[in-house]
């Protein structure tokens, strides 16, 4: 009896531990899955920008769309400033989701800063900047590249303009930083991609015919989607499955050719990249420019006064 009780106790303990692990897995892992898209690039590429200047997000998001960037022309050392990435798209647009249903578009962005520039810590943010970046999870591309920032996917309804709080370097403390003009590169996408990192196509694509022939039947599936039955010139029938949510461009009785599009393009999103320049300005240079400006103004005033004095002297001599 004691042995049976001990066995039952062990079984209950194993069951409890297993259940606890499952719950922890759901709590810890599931939220990260929604942020998996930038991780695709982080895991596959050491740098998000290729030698050609192309940002790697374009490998999965094939359609080209605009993206805008706003940043100050110049900043002082050890200063927090904001860079705004704008990802415009039609507010009425709906994308096809993985299960074939329609939903709102998600957005994501990557900002490639000069070395030394990085995400500003929370304790350096102003109240206004904290409000602008609330509920935004911006992270470095990698532990070694804190000058490259990524975010997404996040809902595009309220995030078509994403504010990145940036901290500029101080050349007095960072010997790698210099007072210079630097480029800033940015990439932004809206909607799902067409290619997974594995190379497989998503359902956000045009489906091409796998064979030529006549469509003799289009079968509607219970869970959505279609099976197209095609008979070729040799009277051999083949079938092709179309994922749920796609809109067919063909009908029964149509004759199709190899690689012909069978559905309308479901993609309403796309990726774009842009760039701007920023100057890390020396405070001493600004002070020098201010001194030079006031010196120039004083010199002009002095010149005008001397000219008027000279004219008075000339006028007095002419009166004699």
UniProtKB/Swiss-Prot annotation:
Membrane-spanning segments: 286-306
Cofactors required: heme
A GO-annotated cellular component: chloroplast thylakoid membrane
GO BP term (any one): photosynthesis
Entry superkingdom: Eukaryota
Cellular compartments annotated: Plastid, Chloroplast thylakoid membrane
GO-annotated molecular function: electron transfer activity; heme binding; iron ion binding
Entry keywords, A to Z: Chloroplast, Electron transport, Heme, Iron, Membrane, Metal-binding, Photosynthesis, Plastid, Signal, Thylakoid, Transmembrane, Transmembrane helix, Transport
UniProt cofactor note: Binds 1 heme group covalently.
Binding residues for heme: 37, 57, 60-61
Membrane topology: Single-pass membrane protein
Chief location category: plastid
Assembly behavior: The 4 large subunits of the cytochrome b6-f complex are cytochrome b6, subunit IV (17 kDa polypeptide, petD), cytochrome f and the Rieske protein, while the 4 small subunits are PetG, PetL, PetM and PetN. The complex functions as a dimer.
UniProt family annotation: Belongs to the cytochrome f family.
Name the UniProt record assigns to this protein: Cytochrome f
Gene: petA
């Amino acid at each position: 009896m004691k042995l049976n009780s001990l066995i039952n106790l062990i079984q209950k303990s194993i069951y409890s531990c297993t259940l606890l692990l499952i719950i922890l897995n759901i709590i810890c892992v599931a939220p990260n899955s929604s942020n998996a898209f930038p991780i695709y690039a982080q895991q596959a590429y050491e740098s998000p920008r290729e030698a050609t200047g192309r940002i790697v997000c374009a490998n999965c998001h094939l359609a080209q769309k605009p993206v805008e960037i706003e940043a100050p022309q110049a900043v002082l050392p050890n200063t927090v400033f904001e860079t705004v990435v704008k990802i415009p798209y039609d507010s009425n647009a709906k994308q096809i989701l993985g299960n074939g249903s329609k939903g709102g578009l998600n957005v994501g962005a990557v900002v490639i800063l000069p070395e030394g520039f990085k995400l500003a810590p929370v304790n350096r943010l102003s109240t206004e900047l904290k409000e602008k970046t609330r509920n935004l999870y911006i992270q470095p591309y990698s532990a070694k590249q804190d000058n490259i920032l990524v975010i997404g996917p996040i809902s595009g309804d309220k995030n078509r303009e994403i504010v990145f709080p940036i901290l500029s370097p101080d050349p007095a403390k960072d010997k790698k930083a210099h007072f210079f003009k630097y480029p800033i590169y940015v990439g932004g996408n809206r909607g799902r991609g067409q290619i997974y990192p594995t190379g497989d196509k998503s359902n956000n694509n045009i489906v091409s015919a796998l064979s030529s022939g006549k469509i003799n039947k289009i079968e509607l599936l219970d869970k959505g989607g279609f099976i197209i039955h095609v008979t070729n010139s040799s009277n051999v029938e083949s079938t092709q499955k179309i994922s749920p949510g796609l809109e067919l461009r063909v009908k029964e009785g149509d004759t199709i050719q190899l690689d012909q599009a069978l559905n309308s393009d479901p993609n309403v999103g796309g990726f774009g990249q842009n760039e701007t320049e920023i100057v890390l300005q020396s405070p001493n240079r600004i002070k020098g420019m201010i001194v030079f400006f006031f010196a120039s103004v004083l010199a002009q005033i002095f010149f005008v006064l001397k000219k008027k004095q000279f004219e008075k002297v000339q006028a007095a001599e002419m009166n004699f």
